[in-house]
Regions:
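Beta-rich, blade/repeat-based domains predominating
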Residues: 35-46, 78-79, 100-122, 166-191, ...
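Short loop/turn segments that connect beta-strands within beta-propeller blades
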Residues: 85-89, 151-155, 205-209, 296-300, ...
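A cross-kingdom C-terminal cell-surface attachment/processing module
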Residues: 397, 401-420
Length: 434
């Protein structure tokens, strides 16, 4: 399918945040692929072509209960795929991948991310989204909840790591057992992945050895959280009070005004300082401004690098040390407004909103091209309506913010700027995510 690029120029707006977020002068985007089914992570191969994962729409096979145990079951099929985008044409070059989804094709677990190593070998992460106890028992042998190594020429693949089974056997965060790996990064001979269901960051060698958790992320304690009105439609009824019911009873040890919510890590990138940076989607009730970016040091200790975001789905560094963060929605998801944002954070802490709404809706992942453009999977939760956008005009630099700028420089900015002054420019690299 050849697409005629539809280019839309958008004046981005200033988004208020404690860091003094600024707006870029203008950003434009073109649609380079559409008609995707639950589009996820995307990545450039060494030959310059762009690849995107499609989680599919499940199928008519066996089913498993949702993570909450309430609501419609998730049913299995082989509708997952990897799609190649080359010279304006899209081609599904890997098909028949496992997929798990609700009856209407939403809420899909399936191919969620793709990466290429230095030799051009691809790896694909397959999501799941339920209790791994039911995976093999209900569905038989599938590659849901695993990292695989595909062969595009033969439309086949081999399993590299079983992340779902690791959660079942180890449960690093000590909470409810669940697995939904969403994104990963290649770091030498290691694959480093986030499991949104297990709330942890894991690593495994490319030869399948030494699968282990690096860190489990803590729950967040919300004070006076805002909940959806009773009766709000939801695929997870346990999250929404029934008619006439109020959320009154906190978990043990919390005051009535407090509520414990899951961290839900969603994406991972390796920073210029060698640490891993992890985006947080947040759990129900998806507090606005409640999402963080964690920094995970070499010793496995995590700290909050930046906060004040809403429902982050991905993040990525460019070759200049700028960090790009992707918001799935600027408001709590239960409000029904899925306008998202792409936010750029400079090494000095400055935040610039490159694009907010205006066609950017429930985006799921991003990557940076060798051309300096940002590529985003858009409408990633809508089967058949998913897109890949190319966002341009992203280089305007606003004045730095104060408080967060000092924090960011203290964290890694000075080291990065010093490195830039005393080394040759890095060659362009392209990495991706969810």
């Amino acid at each position: 399918m050849k697409l005629k690029p539809l280019t839309i120029t958008i004046l981005t707006f200033c988004v208020a945040a404690f860091s003094g977020m600024k707006a870029a002068s203008a950003a434009s985007f073109s649609v380079i692929a559409d008609g995707l089914y639950n589009a996820g992570g995307l990545s450039f191969s060494p030959d310059g072509n762009l690849y995107v994962t499609e989680a599919g729409i499940g199928g008519s096979g066996a089913c498993v209960p949702p993570a909450s145990g309430q609501g419609d079951s998730l049913c299995y099929g082989t509708s997952g795929a990897v799609t190649k985008i080359e010279n304006g044409k899209t081609e599904r070059i890997l098909t028949g991948l496992p997929s798990l989804a609700l009856p209407d094709g939403t809420g899909a677990g399936g191919p969620r991310d793709i990466k290429f190593d230095a030799t051009g070998k691809p790896y694909v992460l397959i999501g799941y989204g339920a209790n791994p106890t039911f995976r093999d028992r209900n569905l038989g042998y599938t590659d849901l909840g695993k990292i695989i190594a595909p062969d595009f020429n033969t439309n086949s693949w081999t399993s590299v790591a079983d992340i779902g089974n690791y959660e079942l056997a180890n449960n690093p965060d000590g909470g409810d057992v669940g697995s939904n790996p969403l994104g990963f990064v290649i770091d030498g001979n290691k694959l480093v992945a986030v499991d949104a269901g297990a709330n942890d960051l894991l690593s495994v060698n490319t030869d399948s050895s030494n699968l282990q958790a690096i860190v489990a992320f803590p729950q967040d304690i919300l004070t006076n959280p805002v909940f959806p009105p009773s009766g709000t439609p939801s695929n997870e009824p346990a999250q929404v009070p029934s008619q006439g019911e109020e959320v009154r009873t906190p978990k043990a040890g919390l005051r009535p005004s407090q509520f414990a919510t899951q961290p839900v890590p969603s994406g991972v990138a390796k920073g210029p300082d060698g640490a891993y940076y992890v985006s947080q989607f947040t759990g129900f009730p998806f507090p606005e401004g409640g999402a963080k970016i964690y920094r995970v040091a070499a010793d496995g200790k995590s700290s909050v690098f930046a906060d004040g975001f809403t429902q982050l789905t991905d993040l990525e560094f460019d070759t200049e040390g700028n960090l790009y963060a992707l918001q799935y929605a600027n408001q709590s998801a239960w409000k029904g407004n899925f306008d998202g944002s792409v936010i750029k954070m400079a090494a000095d802490g400055t935040r610039t909103t490159l694009l907010s709404g205006n066609g950017l809706e429930s985006p799921s992942a991003l990557t940076i091209g060798a051309d300096g453009a940002v590529y985003v999977t858009n409408r990633g939760d809508r089967p058949g309506l998913g897109q890949v956008l190319r966002i341009e005009n992203i280089k305007s630099v606003p004045e730095p913010s104060s408080a967060f700028g000092v924090l960011a420089i203290g964290a890694f900015g000075v080291a990065w700027l010093h490195k830039k002054r005393n080394s040759k420019p890095l060659t362009d690299r392209v990495v991706a995510l969810k």
